[in-house]
Amino acid sequence: IEKMSEHHLKSGGKRLRALLTLESAKLTGYKDEIRDINLAACVELIHSATLLHDDVIDESSLRRGVKTTNSIWGNQSSILVGDYLLSRCFEIMVQDGDLEILQLLSSTSSKIAQGEVLQLQHKGEADLLEETYIDIINLKTAALFSAATKTGACISGSNDKEKKALESYGRNLGLAF
């Protein structure tokens, strides 16, 4: 598991979602630099797990110019490593103890899975409705961007108005991404 996880995590990427968590926490006054790093790692673990699963679903052999985990070790191992990364994320969140963040990131993980299923249901549709397309990217992409920014606000103990503003910013950024 360690070798496969390391291969995937070292295969590149911008770590944008984790950065959004860190910067949102900083923007809203967080200074401790421990919880934000741990919870930004959770956001990145969720994203990495979804990429591992997505590569299996899409039968991808390359991601960012590097062989995918599933192309090296097989689909079954890749799915299990994705599940492992999600489990590690939940362990970190439970240790953190913030139920609002646990609820936010667990529901976001569910939304991402729903978005993937919705995309599969409409695969190959040339006449895909714009509304359906927006629903898919809202669930698959924007949900995690939104959760990343809101998590940063939660870490710093922001008020509801600040949380909603950062959540909205993340969602809009994710839709544009």
What do the PLM-derived regions correspond to, one by one?
Residues 2-177:
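Mg2+-dependent prenyl diphosphate-binding active-site environment of isoprenoid biosynthetic enzymes
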